[in-house]
Amino acid sequence: MTSTVVDAAKPQEETISSAMIFLLASACGLVAANLYYAQPLAGVIGAELGLSSAATGLIVTLTQIGYGLGLLFVVPLGDLVENRRLIVATVGTAVLALIAAALAPHAAPFLAAVFLVGISSVAVQMIVPFAAHMTPHATRGRVVGNVMSGLMVGIMLARPVSSVLSEFVSWRGVFLLSAAVMVVLALVLYRLLPQRVPDAKLPYRSLLASMGHLARNTPILQRRSAYQAAMFGAFSLFWTTTPLYLSGPAFRLTQGEIALFALAGAAGAIAAPIAGRMADRGWTWGATLFALVTAAVSFLITHIASEGTHLSLALLVLAAITLDFAVTTNLVLGQRAIFALGAEYRSRLNGVFMATFFMGGALGSALGGWAYASGQWAAASWLGFALPVMALGFFLTEGRSEKRALKLG
C-alpha cells in the first residue's frame, strides 16, 4: 500500500478534503461513544456481575479515570510517534478492551476492561490535532470545528443509542457491536490516513515533563483550560441531574422519553463548525463572551415556568440545546487558540487542555449529584449557573495582549 506523508515541519497550503473531514469527524464520534455506552446499562451490568449498588458506580468511574490518564500519558505521544500508526494502534486497543468487557465472566475483569476502554478512547484527542496538522492556518478553525462536531454528536448519542440497542441485544451485545465497529474503523483509518512523523526527538520522560512547563508558562492554555473546565463542569452537572429531575415526581418521564430528551440536546453540536469559522475570522473574544453568557442563561430559563408543566419541559429542552451549543462553541474556540501556539507540541497542549477539561466535567458531575440530593433541581441549576458565571468573571480580566494573541491566532 502506498500512502501520503504529511511533512510535520512544513505548513500545510491546501486544506483536507470534505471526505477526510467526514472520516475524522465520524471516527471521533464513534470512538468517543465508547466512553458512554455503559452508563445507562450500569444497573443491569452490575446486577449480572454481582456488583453492589455502590460498586456499580465504578463502571463509570474507572472508565473516566482511564480516559483522564490516557490524556496525560498517551495523547502526548502524538508529538513523538508517527501519528497514523499511533491512532490505529489505540483504536485497535479499544477493540480488545470492548471484547474483553463483553466476555467478562465476573466483575474484576470487566472493570479492568472498561478502564482500558477509557484509556483507548483518547484516540479522539489524537485525531483532532492530526486534523489541525493537515490544515492551513486560515481554515484550521473550520476544520477543527467540523471534526469536533462529530465528537459532540458521539457523546450525546451514545447513551440513547445504548439504551435502544439494549432492548434488542444484551449489554454484552452492545460491547461486541462497538468492537466490530472499531475493527472496521481501524482498517479504514489505516488505509486512508496519511502518515505524519513528528519532529520531536525527546525521550518519553522529557516529553511528559515538558507538559508541566507548557501548563505553567502558556497563559492562553491556562485561560482556555479554565474556561472550558467550568463550561464542561456545567455541562456534566446538567446531564447528571436532568435524568433524575425528569424521572422524578415533577415530570415522571420514562427512560425512553428521557432518551428522546438527550437526542434533542444533540442539536447543540451544530455549534462546532460555526465556532470554527468565527475563530478563523478573528472573532474568538466575542464568540467566547457569547458562549459563556449563553451557558449561564441556559440554566436561568429553566426557572421561568412552574415545575412539571409542558412549558417547563420545553424550556428544559431549549436549555439542553443552548447549553450544548455554548459548551461546544467554547471548546472549539479553545482548541483553535491552543493549536495556533505551535505544531511541534500540539498534542501535549491538547493533552493538558483536555485533561483540565475532563477534570472540570468530573467535578461538575460530583457537585451536581450532591446539589440535587441536597436541594433538587433548584440547587443543582443555580450551581450550574454559577460555573459559567465564574468563568465569565475570569474571562473579563483578559488583557489587551491576550485578546490580540487570540485574534491573531
Give the ranges of each region predicted by the language model.
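Helix-loop-helix hairpin linking two adjacent transmembrane segments in secondary transporters
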Residues: T139, N146-L193
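Juxtamembrane intracellular "pre-TM" segments in multi-pass secondary transporters
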Residues: V6-E14, L193-A226
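Helix-to-loop junctions at the C-terminal end of transmembrane segments
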Residues: L71-E82, A271-T284, Y372
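Cytoplasmic helix-loop-helix junction between adjacent transmembrane helices
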Residues: A113-G150
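Intracellular juxtamembrane helix-capping segments at the cytosolic ends
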Residues: A123-T135, T328-G342
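C-terminal transmembrane helical hairpin of 12-TM major facilitator-type secondary transporters
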Residues: G286-L333
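Structural signature of the two symmetry-related core transmembrane helices
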Residues: R85-I99, G286-I301, F385
